[in-house]
Structures are given as structure tokens and as C-alpha cells.
Amino acid sequence: MNLHEYQGKQLFKEFGLPVSEGYACDTADEAVEAAKRIGGDIWVVKCQVHAGGRGKAGGVKLVKSLDDVRAFAEQWLGKNLVTFQTDEKGQPVAKILVESCTDIADELYLGAVVDRASRKIVFMASTEGGVEIETVAEETPEKILKAEIDPTVGAQPYQGRELGFKLGLTPDQVKQFTKVFMGLAKMFEQYDLALLEINPLVITDEGNVHCLDAKVGIDSNALYRQPKIREMHDPSQDDAREAEAAKWELNYVALDGNIGCMVNGAGLAMGTMDIVKLSGGEPANFLDVGGGATKERVSEAFKIILSDSSVKAVLVNIFGGIVRCDMIAEGIIGAVEEVGVKVPVIVRLEGNNAELGTQKLNESGLNIIAAESLSDAADKVVAAAGGQ
């Protein structure tokens, strides 16, 4: 689960980190009042969406009058912002963040992720702030400094000082940087974060360290013990199909192809997508119905797949271990009858009650094609989708 910038900065303030005075606004009138409250004659106005690249898309602007604040809010509130990280529809803008303007002398990068290889939280810092860190990692990886956090002792001040000195900061700035580093480390652990970025972390004209941006991602598996964070969820930023799948505890990720996939087990789902690709097709989604799938969940999974208008055929690949193939077959039949499926459905059943499941599908009288093997299923679904 991701947070908006203004929500991330609320958490930053909770941990004593330096952020700009700012207010998230729902209307143009609120935006103007926020600018008046902040004072001055220059403000920064930002569209609040769960996507990067806002500045290049016109979603971040420096304004020098209250009329410009109002105009920006009226331009974007209720509209969709399209960036290089969104699809062609973009993300809806429901709030505008109005902030005081910060003078910038230098830009840095500071972020943290959970490194699965080392099984530790890893902080990354760079002098290349204000640009995509992925670009820096690819072109000049030596400019990225790292500090691994030992989970048995937690983050240590010396690690922050070491990063600060390597970034070329002055002793006073290193002290400020270390405070930011320790606050972020505490926040990362306390709120079960999966990703944390400040890009840029700036040095002001006065020589102070300042958090100019906030990108925060939470481990969704930990939300059950984070009620405060759970309340910050903005469902308008979620893919509608992914949100519906989450209600049924289905693991669904929308993709760009035209072959819908429904599989039990994440590994088998990945393998199914691979063989579809190798056979000349393009998967429209990743969908794992899980080992304990019920008839109702299978039916809902089918409806979610078919809600994507780009889907031209569906491949169902089930290995019956915990889940029974005949129950999956009943779910498929129920969904096909309820939704009124117009696209071919190719089904490969193997394992627990596979023969009974195949029999039920064959006797249904629906447009369902049985496959003898996974490779056969992939060939048939690619052909059914037009080989695209």
C-alpha cells in the first residue's frame, strides 16, 4: 500500500524530520486559504497521486500569486494526471498539496528498502538527488552509497554519520543528516514499511538538511497491525480490478496483454505466464486463486479477469492438490454462465479430481476447451486469442 506525499510528510513530522509547511486541499478555495495561512508570495502546488513523474506531467508547479494557486487547483482537482508511471488513463487527483517554497542549494537522495538477498533494511544515499535513482543505479552505480541495518541492533548513528561524510556534507549538516537517518529507520520499522524515498533531500541556502519529498510504501501483509496506516488508504488510486481481487483475497496484478490467466499457486502462475509468452502470446494479468480456493472465489476471479475488455481468451491452469479440480470446474461454469462469456476459455486440470472436473466442463455445453497438457493449453489459448 502506498501513501500520498502529504501523508508521508505527516509521518515525517511525527518523527521530528524537517518538512515544509503545507496543507492538503480538496477544493480551490481551500488551496487559496492554505496559501494565505502559509504566507509569503511564492508557493509550490502539487497534485497528490500515487505515481512519479508528476513534475514533467505538469502536476507540480511553482506559483507566485493566489490567482495562480486557484487556477492550478481548478485545473487538476477532479481530473486525471498521466505520467510515465501511470497507464493512459492516469491517476485521479482528489487533493492538491500547497507548500511553502524552499530555496535549494543542493539536492541529495535518501531511500530505504527491504533487501531480500541480505534480509535486511538497506539505506541508499546519493549526491544525485532530484533524478530517477534507477537511472543513477544503471549509469553510475558507484554514486550510490549503502548502509545495511542489522535487525538485531537496529540503525546506529555512526551509519548515518558515515553516509553524511561520504556525501560531502559539513559537520553540522552531518549531524542533521544523522537525525533524519535515525528518524527514518525508526519509522521504517515501526510502521512496517517496504519502501521509503526522499528525492530530493535538499540542502537549503541556509545550509540546513530538508525533506522536500516523501514516497512511502507499506508492506500490505502488515496492515492488520497498522490501523493508523490502514486509514490512510486511498482506494481511488488502486486499479479497480486489483482492489476487487483484494476483497476476495486473490493475488491479482493487471498487465498489458490479451490472454487472461487464472492459476492456483504463485509459482505455477509465473510459469504459466512464461509459457504463454514463449508460445507467442501476451498475458493480460497475473492471478493466483490460492491453494484454499472456494467456488465463490474462483467465480469472482473469473469475473475480474473478464472485466478487462482487452482479454480475448482465458487460460485456466489448475493443479489439484489442496484444491479440488471439480470444485474449480463448478466455479468456472458458474462464472461463465453468470457473466455471459463471449471469449474462448481453455482449461488445463491436473491432479485431485481432475477427471471429474474435466467431465463437468465437457458436459456444461459452454465454450470451454479442454487441454491435455500445459504446452497444449498455451498453444490453444494463443491461437484462440488470434496469436496476438
From Swiss-Prot:
Domain ATP-grasp intervals: 9-244
Pathway assigned to this chain's UniProt record: Carbohydrate metabolism; tricarboxylic acid cycle; succinate from succinyl-CoA (ligase route): step 1/1
Highest rank taxon of the organism: Bacteria
Gene3D superfamilies on file: ATP-grasp fold, A domain (3.30.1490.20), ATP-grasp fold, B domain (3.30.470.20), Succinyl-CoA synthetase domains (3.40.50.261)
EC number(s) recorded for this UniProt protein: 6.2.1.5
Positions bound to ATP: K46, G53, R54, G55, E99, T102, E107
Binding-site residues, Mg(2+): N199, D213
GO biological process terms on file: succinyl-CoA metabolic process; tricarboxylic acid cycle
Binding-site positions, substrate: N264, G321, I322, V323
A molecular function (GO) term: magnesium ion binding
Needed cofactors: Mg(2+)
Pfam families: ATP-grasp_2, Ligase_CoA
GO cellular component term of the entry, any: cytosol
InterPro entries: ATP-grasp (IPR011761), ATP-grasp_succ-CoA_synth-type (IPR013650), ATP_grasp_subdomain_1 (IPR013815), Succ-CoA_synthase_bsu_CS (IPR017866), SUCC_ACL_C (IPR005811), Succ_CoA_ligase-like_bsu (IPR005809), Succinyl-CoA_synth-like (IPR016102)
Catalytic activity from the UniProt record: succinate + ATP + CoA = succinyl-CoA + ADP + phosphate; GTP + succinate + CoA = succinyl-CoA + GDP + phosphate
Cofactor, free-text remark: Binds 1 Mg(2+) ion per subunit.
Sorted UniProt keywords: ATP-binding, Ligase, Magnesium, Metal-binding, Nucleotide-binding, Tricarboxylic acid cycle
Quaternary structure, from the entry: Heterotetramer of two alpha and two beta subunits.
Main function: Succinyl-CoA synthetase functions in the citric acid cycle (TCA), coupling the hydrolysis of succinyl-CoA to the synthesis of either ATP or GTP and thus represents the only step of substrate-level phosphorylation in the TCA. The beta subunit provides nucleotide specificity of the enzyme and binds the substrate succinate, while the binding sites for coenzyme A and phosphate are found in the alpha subunit.
PANTHER family found in the cross-reference section: SUCCINATE--COA LIGASE [GDP-FORMING] SUBUNIT BETA, MITOCHONDRIAL, SUCCINYL-COA SYNTHETASE BETA CHAIN
Family affiliation: Belongs to the succinate/malate CoA ligase beta subunit family.
Record protein name field: Succinate--CoA ligase [ADP-forming] subunit beta
Organism: Idiomarina loihiensis (strain ATCC BAA-735 / DSM 15497 / L2-TR)
